[in-house]
């Protein structure tokens, strides 16, 4: 896949894209919109840009009429990509009235060095005249707030007792309808005693072989929504080689130049979550991370609020309440993943292969999907909610569960084969501090600048893929093998046999009734 060259998208083009999308009776997928935009304007546009333009952040464009003289009056800026990035940075800062001219100029200079198109050019003199023009071109459009069903508790509210305020909401709700969501980074190639590797891509420092995971579950541990995985490439090499569809494999894939959560992705996630909760009234607990706050604000101001979800933004500085996922859920997920990864390393070493070269991001995600859907017990999730305090007074009897300890023990044994020291420092391997999500002004600038990086056809540190497409005939042979295996087991399970036979029937329909007798004889 060739590189996508970033070019500034004008307000006229954004308005046209929104108008085209929202007037469709059968809404197009984002790839269809990318093709439409290319044919219409002769430009390439990335999937994250499409998602952002369709978000409520640009809903003001729907309520304005483009006047014939607008194009002449609002002449394009000399540095359109810079101003687009700077405006996004300004929005992320909140009330632009608090930003001095010098602050905006400093941010412009930093962004200039990080946007690839400008890196070989000298930094302009950001004069007061330029500043005045920028402010005129990028007035923050106020949107009339509509009544909203969402309840948002955050650090801007009176600092009384955050525990009791959250509990006032959760105590009236069945625990099956109380959800939490949180992100974490993951170095999917990290080895015991290893350190995360970094790379500099045109002024933006980022980690190699890193993804961001978004996990969401309810307080009883009975519901775990599919993982959202954010990487660097819009379509990693291995996805194309294996012809995989992420949704079929129970995860969703998004991308940007920092492999991190953005306001646009978070807003998309919130609306997806709300659609998953159709017909219910649920509570969603999120933390006070800037993309979360901006996404919630965009939705509340859009006039198209969440229908089934009450959002509670947890205070980030409270000693009495914490994010449930931080109380063992994410740690358990990472521990399960590391166990699969270390087992793979040892197996590949025995075969004389380099596991660092033979693995890929798809295999890593499948280990994560397995860990999330089958390896983590409901007890770990329930215990995490009790420890967090979101369900009421802190439960002092809630301690790290035996299930979590039992999960870590086999990993420690495996890691000890590398070194005793690595086994003793198992926590640093399971969840290194560099994987923590950081919310800082420098991080915001890097996230914004990364949107203007050229798309890559592969993940960082991703080797040439050795994955191959599985034919229906291959799948049928595998089913036959599994049926025979299950029939030979002393504790064979009829339910498994029935499931395999049902899947076999599905394969027959897909493959045009492949001849089973021929399969058995080959």
From Swiss-Prot:
Q: Which InterPro entries match?
A: CenT-Element_Derived (IPR050863), DDE_SF_endonuclease_dom (IPR004875), Homeodomain-like_sf (IPR009057), HTH_ABP1_N (IPR041188), HTH_CenpB_DNA-bd_dom (IPR006600)
- Transcription is among the record's keywords: no
Highest rank taxon of the organism = Eukaryota
Question: A GO biological process this protein is involved in?
Answer: donor selection
Alphabetized, the UniProt keywords read:
DNA-binding, Nucleus, Phosphoprotein
Q: Where in the cell is it found?
A: Nucleus
- A GO term, aspect molecular function: chromatin-protein adaptor activity
**Domain HTH CENPB-type stretches:** 70-144
Show the PROSITE patterns listed in the entry: HTH_CENPB
In-chain residues carrying the UniProt-annotated modification Phosphothreonine: 460
Can you supply one Gene Ontology CC term for this chain's record? chromatin
State which residue ranges cross the membrane. none
Please state the protein's primary subcellular location: nucleus
Q: Which PANTHER family match?
A: PROTEIN PDC2, TRANSPOSON
Q: How does it assemble?
A: Interacts with mcm10.
Instruction: Sum up the protein's function in the record's words.
Output: Binds, preferentially, to the Maundrell ARS consensus sequence within ARS3002.
Q: Please identify the protein, giving its name as recorded.
A: ARS-binding protein 1
| Species, as recorded | Schizosaccharomyces pombe (strain 972 / ATCC 24843) (Fission yeast)
């Amino acid at each position: 896949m060739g590189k996508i060259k970033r070019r500034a998208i004008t307000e006229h083009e954004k308005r046209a894209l929104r108008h085209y999308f929202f007037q469709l009776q059968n809404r197009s997928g984002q790839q269809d919109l990318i093709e439409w935009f290319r044919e219409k304007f002769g430009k390439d546009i990335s999937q994250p840009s499409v998602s952002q333009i369709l978000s409520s952040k640009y809903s003001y464009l729907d309520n304005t009429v483009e006047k014939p003289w607008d194009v002449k009056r609002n002449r394009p800026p000399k540095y359109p990509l810079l101003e687009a990035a700077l405006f996004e940075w300004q929005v992320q800062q909140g009330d632009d009235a608090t930003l001095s001219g010098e602050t905006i100029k400093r941010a412009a200079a930093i962004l200039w060095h990080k946007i690839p198109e400008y890196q070989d050019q000298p930094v302009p003199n950001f004069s007061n005249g330029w500043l005045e023009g920028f402010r005129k071109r990028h007035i923050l459009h106020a949107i009339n707030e509509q009544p909203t069903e969402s309840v948002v508790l955050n650090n801007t509210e009176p600092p009384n007792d955050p525990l009791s305020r959250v509990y006032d909401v959760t105590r009236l709700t069945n625990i099956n309808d109380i959800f939490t969501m949180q992100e974490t980074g993951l170095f999917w190639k990290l080895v015991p005693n290893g350190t995360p590797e970094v790379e500099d891509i045109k002024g933006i420092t980022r980690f190699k072989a890193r993804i961001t995971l978004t996990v969401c579950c309810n307080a009883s541990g009975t519901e775990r929504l599919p993982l959202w995985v954010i990487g660097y490439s819009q379509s990693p090499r291995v996805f194309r080689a294996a012809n995989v569809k992420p949704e079929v494999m129970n995860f969703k894939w998004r991308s940007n130049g920092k492999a991190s959560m953005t306001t646009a992705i978070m807003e998309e996630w919130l609306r997806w979550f709300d659609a998953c909760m159709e017909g219910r009234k649920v509570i969603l607990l999120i933390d006070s991370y800037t993309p979360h706050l901006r996404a919630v604000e965009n939705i509340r101001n859009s006039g198209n609020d969440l229908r089934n979800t009450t959002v509670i933004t947890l205070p980030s500085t409270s000693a009495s309440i914490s994010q449930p996922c931080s109380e063992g859920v994410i740690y358990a997920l990472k521990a399960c993943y590391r166990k699969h990864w270390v087992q793979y390393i040892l197996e590949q070493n025995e075969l004389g292969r380099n596991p660092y070269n033979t693995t890929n991001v798809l295999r890593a995600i499948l280990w994560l999907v397995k860990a999330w859907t089958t390896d983590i017990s409901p007890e770990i999730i329930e215990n995490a909610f009790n420890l967090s305090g979101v369900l009421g007074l802190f439960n002092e009897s809630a301690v790290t569960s035996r299930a979590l300890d039992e999960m870590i023990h086999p990993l420690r044994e495996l890691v000890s084969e590398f070194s005793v020291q690595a086994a003793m420092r198992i926590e640093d391997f399971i969840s290194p501090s560099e994987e923590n999500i950081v919310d800082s002004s420098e991080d915001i600038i890097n996230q914004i600048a990364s949107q203007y990086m050229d798309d890559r056809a592969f993940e960082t540190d991703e080797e040439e893929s050795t994955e191959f497409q599985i034919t229906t005939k291959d799948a049928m042979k595998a089913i036959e093998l599994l049926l025979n295996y299950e029939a030979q087991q002393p504790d064979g399970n009829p339910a498994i046999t029935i499931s395999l036979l049902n899947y076999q029937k599905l394969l027959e329909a897909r493959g045009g009734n492949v001849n089973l007798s021929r399969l058995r004889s080959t």
